[in-house]
Amino acid sequence: GWKDWLNKGKEWLKKKGPGIMKAALKAATQ
């Protein structure tokens, strides 16, 4: 169901979120 999908999204953000933020900051500062 959609709740499972939502939980997967949260787990993915926990793992990938910091890396994505760092990449975005790098792109913004160039």
From Swiss-Prot:
This is M-poneritoxin-Ng3c. The keyword Lipid biosynthesis does not apply. Belongs to the ponericin-G family. Keywords: Antibiotic, Antimicrobial, Fungicide, Secreted, Toxin. Shows a broad spectrum of activity against both Gram-positive and Gram-negative bacteria. Also has antimicrobial activity against S.cerevisiae. Has insecticidal and non-hemolytic activity. GO terms for biological process: defense response to bacterium; defense response to fungus; killing of cells of another organism. InterPro entries: Poneritoxin. Its main location: secreted. Expressed by the venom gland. Disulfide bonds: none annotated. One of its GO terms (cellular component) is extracellular region. One of its GO terms (molecular function) is toxin activity. The keyword Secreted applies. It comes from the Eukaryota. It is found in: Secreted.
